[in-house]
Amino acid sequence: MSRSTYSLEQLADFLKVEFQGNGATLLSGVEEIEEAKTAHITFLDNEKYAKHLKSSEAGAIIISRTQFQKYRDLNKNFLITSESPSLVFQKCLELFITPVDSGFPGIHPTAVIHPTAIIEDHVCIEPYAVVCQHAHVGSACHIGSGSVIGAYSTVGQHSYIHPRVVIRERVSIGKRVIIQPGAVIGSCGFGYVTSAFGQHKHLKHLGKVIIEDDVEIGANTTIDRGRFKHSVVREGSKIDNLVQIAHQVEVGQHSMIVAQAGIAGSTKIGNHVIIGGQAGITGHICIADHVIMMAQTGVTKSITSPGIYGGAPARPYQEIHRQVAKVRNLPRLEERIAALEKLVQKLEALSEQH
Protein backbone atom coordinates (compact mmCIF):
# COMPACT_ATOMS: atom_id res chain seq x y z
CA MET A 1 0.00 0.00 0.00
CA SER A 2 1.51 3.34 -1.06
CA ARG A 3 1.84 6.31 1.28
CA SER A 4 -1.09 7.98 -0.47
CA THR A 5 -3.45 5.03 -0.02
CA TYR A 6 -5.36 4.59 3.23
CA SER A 7 -8.09 2.32 4.47
CA LEU A 8 -11.40 3.73 5.65
CA GLU A 9 -10.50 2.72 9.21
CA GLN A 10 -7.10 4.47 9.00
CA LEU A 11 -8.73 7.64 7.71
CA ALA A 12 -11.32 7.60 10.48
CA ASP A 13 -8.50 7.31 13.01
CA PHE A 14 -6.52 10.14 11.39
CA LEU A 15 -9.57 12.41 11.21
CA LYS A 16 -10.77 11.38 14.69
CA VAL A 17 -14.26 10.53 13.46
CA GLU A 18 -16.51 7.48 13.50
CA PHE A 19 -17.20 5.39 10.42
CA GLN A 20 -19.88 3.08 9.08
CA GLY A 21 -19.14 0.47 6.45
CA ASN A 22 -16.21 -1.64 5.32
CA GLY A 23 -13.16 -0.40 7.24
CA ALA A 24 -10.82 -2.17 4.81
CA THR A 25 -11.97 -0.07 1.82
CA LEU A 26 -8.89 1.52 0.22
CA LEU A 27 -8.96 5.22 -0.65
CA SER A 28 -6.33 7.06 -2.67
CA GLY A 29 -7.82 10.38 -3.72
CA VAL A 30 -10.44 13.08 -3.25
CA GLU A 31 -13.24 14.24 -5.56
CA GLU A 32 -16.57 16.08 -5.54
CA ILE A 33 -19.60 13.94 -4.89
CA GLU A 34 -20.89 13.80 -8.49
CA GLU A 35 -17.55 12.66 -9.95
CA ALA A 36 -16.16 10.47 -7.15
CA LYS A 37 -15.22 6.85 -7.93
CA THR A 38 -14.60 3.86 -5.67
CA ALA A 39 -11.07 4.98 -4.66
CA HIS A 40 -12.19 8.52 -3.80
CA ILE A 41 -13.32 10.13 -0.59
CA THR A 42 -15.88 12.94 -0.86
CA PHE A 43 -18.20 14.91 1.42
CA LEU A 44 -21.73 16.21 1.75
CA ASP A 45 -22.10 19.64 3.31
CA ASN A 46 -24.78 21.44 1.31
CA GLU A 47 -28.10 19.57 1.27
CA LYS A 48 -28.59 20.63 -2.36
CA TYR A 49 -26.18 17.84 -3.28
CA ALA A 50 -27.88 15.14 -1.21
CA LYS A 51 -29.64 14.01 -4.41
CA HIS A 52 -26.29 12.58 -5.55
CA LEU A 53 -25.81 10.39 -2.47
CA LYS A 54 -27.68 7.35 -3.71
CA SER A 55 -25.93 7.22 -7.10
CA SER A 56 -22.48 8.24 -5.86
CA GLU A 57 -19.72 5.69 -6.48
CA ALA A 58 -17.46 7.24 -3.82
CA GLY A 59 -15.50 4.86 -1.62
CA ALA A 60 -16.34 7.00 1.42
CA ILE A 61 -18.50 10.05 2.14
CA ILE A 62 -17.96 12.49 5.00
CA ILE A 63 -21.27 13.62 6.50
CA SER A 64 -22.51 15.28 9.68
CA ARG A 65 -24.23 13.34 12.46
CA THR A 66 -27.56 14.91 11.53
CA GLN A 67 -27.14 13.86 7.89
CA PHE A 68 -26.10 10.37 8.95
CA GLN A 69 -29.41 9.88 10.74
CA LYS A 70 -31.21 10.71 7.47
CA TYR A 71 -29.06 8.65 5.09
CA ARG A 72 -27.65 5.78 7.15
CA ASP A 73 -29.84 3.23 5.30
CA LEU A 74 -28.17 3.93 1.92
CA ASN A 75 -25.55 1.24 2.62
CA LYS A 76 -22.60 3.57 1.98
CA ASN A 77 -19.21 3.93 3.65
CA PHE A 78 -19.70 6.98 5.85
CA LEU A 79 -17.29 9.03 7.95
CA ILE A 80 -19.41 10.74 10.60
CA THR A 81 -18.34 14.07 12.07
CA SER A 82 -19.58 16.61 14.58
CA GLU A 83 -17.71 19.33 12.65
CA SER A 84 -18.43 20.75 9.22
CA PRO A 85 -17.95 17.95 6.65
CA SER A 86 -16.19 20.46 4.41
CA LEU A 87 -13.68 21.22 7.17
CA VAL A 88 -12.95 17.53 7.75
CA PHE A 89 -12.60 16.99 3.99
CA GLN A 90 -9.99 19.76 3.95
CA LYS A 91 -7.89 17.67 6.34
CA CYS A 92 -7.99 14.82 3.82
CA LEU A 93 -6.29 17.05 1.27
CA GLU A 94 -3.22 17.08 3.51
CA LEU A 95 -2.93 13.34 2.92
CA PHE A 96 -3.78 13.04 -0.75
CA ILE A 97 -2.70 16.29 -2.41
CA THR A 98 0.94 17.32 -2.74
CA PRO A 99 1.34 21.12 -2.93
CA VAL A 100 2.77 22.39 -6.23
CA ASP A 101 6.19 23.93 -5.72
CA SER A 102 7.50 26.81 -7.84
CA GLY A 103 10.80 25.00 -8.37
CA PHE A 104 12.84 27.94 -7.05
CA PRO A 105 14.10 27.00 -3.59
CA GLY A 106 16.06 29.48 -1.53
CA ILE A 107 16.90 32.96 -2.75
CA HIS A 108 17.09 33.23 -6.54
CA PRO A 109 20.14 35.08 -7.92
CA THR A 110 17.91 37.55 -9.82
CA ALA A 111 16.16 38.67 -6.64
CA VAL A 112 17.19 42.19 -5.58
CA ILE A 113 17.75 42.50 -1.83
CA HIS A 114 18.97 45.70 -0.22
CA PRO A 115 22.03 45.23 2.04
CA THR A 116 20.13 46.58 5.05
CA ALA A 117 17.21 44.17 4.64
CA ILE A 118 16.91 41.33 7.16
CA ILE A 119 16.13 37.90 5.73
CA GLU A 120 15.59 35.16 8.32
CA ASP A 121 16.17 31.41 7.86
CA HIS A 122 14.41 29.10 5.41
CA VAL A 123 13.05 31.92 3.24
CA CYS A 124 12.23 31.44 -0.44
CA ILE A 125 12.54 34.53 -2.65
CA GLU A 126 11.65 33.82 -6.28
CA PRO A 127 13.09 35.42 -9.45
CA TYR A 128 12.99 39.21 -9.81
CA ALA A 129 11.45 39.88 -6.41
CA VAL A 130 12.64 43.06 -4.66
CA VAL A 131 13.23 43.55 -0.94
CA CYS A 132 13.89 47.22 -0.14
CA GLN A 133 15.99 48.88 2.55
CA HIS A 134 15.42 47.90 6.18
CA ALA A 135 12.64 45.48 5.23
CA HIS A 136 12.36 42.38 7.41
CA VAL A 137 11.26 39.00 6.04
CA GLY A 138 10.52 36.41 8.74
CA SER A 139 11.56 32.76 8.76
CA ALA A 140 9.91 30.27 6.40
CA CYS A 141 8.34 33.03 4.28
CA HIS A 142 7.77 32.72 0.55
CA ILE A 143 8.10 35.80 -1.66
CA GLY A 144 6.79 35.22 -5.19
CA SER A 145 8.32 36.32 -8.49
CA GLY A 146 8.16 40.03 -9.18
CA SER A 147 6.82 40.93 -5.75
CA VAL A 148 8.07 44.01 -3.90
CA ILE A 149 8.57 44.33 -0.15
CA GLY A 150 8.84 48.04 0.53
CA ALA A 151 11.26 49.91 2.76
CA TYR A 152 10.82 49.39 6.52
CA SER A 153 8.08 46.83 5.94
CA THR A 154 7.90 43.52 7.78
CA VAL A 155 6.57 40.14 6.71
CA GLY A 156 5.87 37.72 9.56
CA GLN A 157 6.95 34.09 9.79
CA HIS A 158 5.39 31.48 7.50
CA SER A 159 3.65 34.07 5.33
CA TYR A 160 3.16 33.38 1.62
CA ILE A 161 3.35 36.31 -0.77
CA HIS A 162 2.35 35.20 -4.28
CA PRO A 163 3.85 36.66 -7.49
CA ARG A 164 3.49 40.35 -8.37
CA VAL A 165 2.29 41.52 -4.99
CA VAL A 166 3.26 45.07 -4.01
CA ILE A 167 3.77 45.72 -0.31
CA ARG A 168 4.61 49.39 -0.01
CA GLU A 169 6.82 51.08 2.59
CA ARG A 170 6.12 50.83 6.35
CA VAL A 171 3.60 48.01 6.05
CA SER A 172 3.36 45.35 8.74
CA ILE A 173 2.35 41.84 7.64
CA GLY A 174 1.71 39.31 10.42
CA LYS A 175 2.43 35.60 10.67
CA ARG A 176 0.89 32.99 8.34
CA VAL A 177 -0.59 35.65 6.08
CA ILE A 178 -1.44 34.69 2.48
CA ILE A 179 -1.56 37.40 -0.20
CA GLN A 180 -2.65 36.42 -3.71
CA PRO A 181 -1.19 37.80 -6.97
CA GLY A 182 -1.70 41.42 -7.91
CA ALA A 183 -2.66 42.69 -4.47
CA VAL A 184 -1.36 46.13 -3.47
CA ILE A 185 -0.93 46.86 0.22
CA GLY A 186 -0.11 50.36 1.40
CA SER A 187 -0.90 52.65 -1.51
CA CYS A 188 -1.74 56.25 -0.64
CA GLY A 189 -5.41 56.77 0.14
CA PHE A 190 -7.81 58.59 -2.17
CA GLY A 191 -7.60 61.84 -0.24
CA TYR A 192 -7.78 65.23 -1.95
CA VAL A 193 -8.52 68.84 -1.07
CA THR A 194 -10.08 71.18 -3.63
CA SER A 195 -8.48 74.59 -4.03
CA ALA A 196 -10.30 77.88 -4.56
CA PHE A 197 -9.63 77.40 -8.28
CA GLY A 198 -11.33 73.99 -8.36
CA GLN A 199 -8.10 72.01 -8.55
CA HIS A 200 -7.82 68.72 -6.62
CA LYS A 201 -4.63 68.51 -4.57
CA HIS A 202 -3.54 65.12 -3.27
CA LEU A 203 -2.92 64.87 0.48
CA LYS A 204 0.10 63.05 1.86
CA HIS A 205 -0.76 59.85 3.69
CA LEU A 206 1.59 59.15 6.58
CA GLY A 207 -0.17 56.19 8.20
CA LYS A 208 0.72 52.53 7.90
CA VAL A 209 -1.15 49.39 6.93
CA ILE A 210 -1.18 46.65 9.56
CA ILE A 211 -2.21 43.13 8.55
CA GLU A 212 -2.45 40.85 11.57
CA ASP A 213 -1.82 37.09 11.83
CA ASP A 214 -3.69 34.51 9.72
CA VAL A 215 -5.24 37.04 7.35
CA GLU A 216 -5.79 36.07 3.69
CA ILE A 217 -5.99 38.68 0.94
CA GLY A 218 -7.30 37.88 -2.55
CA ALA A 219 -5.95 38.69 -5.99
CA ASN A 220 -6.00 42.34 -7.12
CA THR A 221 -7.27 43.57 -3.78
CA THR A 222 -6.05 46.97 -2.58
CA ILE A 223 -5.65 48.22 0.97
CA ASP A 224 -4.69 51.89 1.26
CA ARG A 225 -2.68 53.53 4.03
CA GLY A 226 -4.28 56.17 6.24
CA ARG A 227 -3.57 59.88 6.17
CA PHE A 228 -2.58 59.91 9.85
CA LYS A 229 -3.97 56.76 11.48
CA HIS A 230 -3.27 53.23 10.32
CA SER A 231 -5.43 50.99 8.13
CA VAL A 232 -5.81 47.68 9.98
CA VAL A 233 -7.05 44.18 9.12
CA ARG A 234 -7.38 42.21 12.33
CA GLU A 235 -6.47 38.59 13.02
CA GLY A 236 -8.03 35.83 10.95
CA SER A 237 -10.02 37.95 8.51
CA LYS A 238 -10.40 36.75 4.91
CA ILE A 239 -10.64 39.13 1.96
CA ASP A 240 -11.68 37.99 -1.52
CA ASN A 241 -10.42 39.19 -4.91
CA LEU A 242 -10.97 42.74 -6.20
CA VAL A 243 -11.83 44.31 -2.87
CA GLN A 244 -11.09 47.99 -2.18
CA ILE A 245 -10.31 48.97 1.42
CA ALA A 246 -9.72 52.70 1.73
CA HIS A 247 -7.53 54.77 4.05
CA GLN A 248 -7.86 54.41 7.83
CA VAL A 249 -10.37 51.54 7.60
CA GLU A 250 -10.30 48.97 10.38
CA VAL A 251 -11.56 45.44 9.70
CA GLY A 252 -12.23 43.40 12.85
CA GLN A 253 -11.20 39.86 13.70
CA HIS A 254 -12.40 36.87 11.66
CA SER A 255 -14.48 38.91 9.25
CA MET A 256 -15.05 38.01 5.59
CA ILE A 257 -15.26 40.41 2.64
CA VAL A 258 -16.47 39.01 -0.69
CA ALA A 259 -15.32 40.09 -4.16
CA GLN A 260 -15.84 43.62 -5.49
CA ALA A 261 -16.92 45.05 -2.15
CA GLY A 262 -15.71 48.54 -1.32
CA ILE A 263 -15.21 50.21 2.06
CA ALA A 264 -14.73 53.98 2.13
CA GLY A 265 -12.27 55.78 4.38
CA SER A 266 -12.25 55.80 8.20
CA THR A 267 -14.98 53.17 8.53
CA LYS A 268 -14.68 50.59 11.30
CA ILE A 269 -15.87 47.03 10.63
CA GLY A 270 -16.57 44.84 13.67
CA ASN A 271 -15.59 41.25 14.43
CA HIS A 272 -17.14 38.27 12.60
CA VAL A 273 -18.75 40.49 9.97
CA ILE A 274 -19.60 39.11 6.52
CA ILE A 275 -19.73 41.61 3.64
CA GLY A 276 -21.35 40.25 0.47
CA GLY A 277 -20.12 40.74 -3.08
CA GLN A 278 -20.32 44.25 -4.56
CA ALA A 279 -21.47 45.73 -1.27
CA GLY A 280 -20.58 49.38 -0.81
CA ILE A 281 -19.96 50.98 2.58
CA THR A 282 -19.68 54.73 3.01
CA GLY A 283 -16.95 56.38 5.06
CA HIS A 284 -16.74 57.44 8.71
CA ILE A 285 -19.27 54.91 10.05
CA CYS A 286 -19.16 51.82 12.30
CA ILE A 287 -20.47 48.31 11.63
CA ALA A 288 -21.32 46.20 14.70
CA ASP A 289 -20.00 42.70 15.36
CA HIS A 290 -21.80 39.74 13.73
CA VAL A 291 -23.40 41.75 10.94
CA ILE A 292 -24.09 40.01 7.61
CA MET A 293 -24.51 42.16 4.50
CA MET A 294 -26.14 40.62 1.45
CA ALA A 295 -24.65 41.13 -2.00
CA GLN A 296 -24.87 44.68 -3.39
CA THR A 297 -25.91 46.15 -0.07
CA GLY A 298 -25.43 49.92 0.09
CA VAL A 299 -24.55 51.06 3.61
CA THR A 300 -24.97 54.80 4.20
CA LYS A 301 -24.97 54.97 8.00
CA SER A 302 -23.69 52.98 10.98
CA ILE A 303 -25.19 49.58 11.76
CA THR A 304 -25.37 49.15 15.53
CA SER A 305 -27.10 45.77 15.91
CA PRO A 306 -26.10 42.27 14.73
CA GLY A 307 -28.23 40.74 12.00
CA ILE A 308 -28.70 40.32 8.27
CA TYR A 309 -28.94 43.48 6.17
CA GLY A 310 -29.50 44.18 2.50
CA GLY A 311 -30.73 46.69 -0.05
CA ALA A 312 -29.74 50.28 -0.69
CA PRO A 313 -29.87 51.99 1.67
CA ALA A 314 -29.18 49.01 3.93
CA ARG A 315 -32.01 47.80 6.14
CA PRO A 316 -32.83 44.59 8.03
CA TYR A 317 -33.51 41.55 5.86
CA GLN A 318 -36.96 41.01 7.40
CA GLU A 319 -37.98 44.49 6.28
CA ILE A 320 -36.73 43.83 2.75
CA HIS A 321 -38.63 40.54 2.69
CA ARG A 322 -41.87 42.31 3.64
CA GLN A 323 -41.31 44.98 0.99
CA VAL A 324 -40.65 42.37 -1.69
CA ALA A 325 -43.86 40.58 -0.73
CA LYS A 326 -45.79 43.85 -1.07
CA VAL A 327 -44.25 44.57 -4.46
CA ARG A 328 -45.20 41.08 -5.60
CA ASN A 329 -48.82 41.85 -4.70
CA LEU A 330 -48.93 45.15 -6.62
CA PRO A 331 -50.59 43.66 -9.77
CA ARG A 332 -53.47 42.32 -7.67
CA LEU A 333 -53.77 45.62 -5.81
CA GLU A 334 -53.89 47.43 -9.15
CA GLU A 335 -56.74 45.18 -10.29
CA ARG A 336 -58.64 45.81 -7.04
CA ILE A 337 -58.16 49.57 -7.34
CA ALA A 338 -59.39 49.49 -10.95
CA ALA A 339 -62.47 47.52 -9.87
CA LEU A 340 -63.13 49.99 -7.06
CA GLU A 341 -62.80 52.92 -9.48
CA LYS A 342 -65.41 51.35 -11.76
CA LEU A 343 -67.71 50.79 -8.80
CA VAL A 344 -67.31 54.41 -7.69
CA GLN A 345 -68.07 55.60 -11.22
CA LYS A 346 -71.27 53.51 -11.28
CA LEU A 347 -72.35 54.83 -7.89
CA GLU A 348 -71.68 58.41 -8.98
CA ALA A 349 -73.74 57.86 -12.15
CA LEU A 350 -76.64 56.46 -10.11
CA SER A 351 -76.38 59.40 -7.72
CA GLU A 352 -76.62 61.89 -10.60
CA GLN A 353 -79.73 60.14 -11.97
CA HIS A 354 -81.53 60.64 -8.68
From Swiss-Prot:
<comment type="pathway">
    <text>Bacterial outer membrane biogenesis; LPS lipid A biosynthesis.</text>
</comment>
<dbReference type="GO" id="GO:0016020">
    <property type="term" value="C:membrane"/>
</dbReference>
<dbReference type="Pfam" id="PF00132">
    <property type="entry name" value="Hexapep"/>
</dbReference>
<comment type="function">
    <text>Catalyzes the N-acylation of UDP-3-O-acylglucosamine using 3-hydroxyacyl-ACP as the acyl donor. Is involved in the biosynthesis of lipid A, a phosphorylated glycolipid that anchors the lipopolysaccharide to the outer membrane of the cell.</text>
</comment>
<dbReference type="GO" id="GO:0016410">
    <property type="term" value="F:N-acyltransferase activity"/>
</dbReference>
<dbReference type="InterPro" id="IPR011004">
    <property type="entry name" value="Trimer_LpxA-like_sf"/>
</dbReference>
<keyword id="KW-0441">Lipid A biosynthesis</keyword>
<keyword id="KW-0808">Transferase</keyword>
<comment type="subunit">
    <text>Homotrimer.</text>
</comment>
<dbReference type="GO" id="GO:0009245">
    <property type="term" value="P:lipid A biosynthetic process"/>
</dbReference>
<dbReference type="InterPro" id="IPR007691">
    <property type="entry name" value="LpxD"/>
</dbReference>
<keyword id="KW-0444">Lipid biosynthesis</keyword>
<keyword id="KW-0443">Lipid metabolism</keyword>
<keyword id="KW-0677">Repeat</keyword>
<dbReference type="InterPro" id="IPR020573">
    <property type="entry name" value="UDP_GlcNAc_AcTrfase_non-rep"/>
</dbReference>
<dbReference type="Pfam" id="PF04613">
    <property type="entry name" value="LpxD"/>
</dbReference>
<feature type="active site" description="Proton acceptor">
    <location>
        <position position="247"/>
    </location>
</feature>
<protein>
    <recommendedName>
        <fullName>UDP-3-O-acylglucosamine N-acyltransferase</fullName>
        <ecNumber>2.3.1.191</ecNumber>
    </recommendedName>
</protein>
<comment type="similarity">
    <text>Belongs to the transferase hexapeptide repeat family. LpxD subfamily.</text>
</comment>
<dbReference type="InterPro" id="IPR001451">
    <property type="entry name" value="Hexapep"/>
</dbReference>
<keyword id="KW-0012">Acyltransferase</keyword>
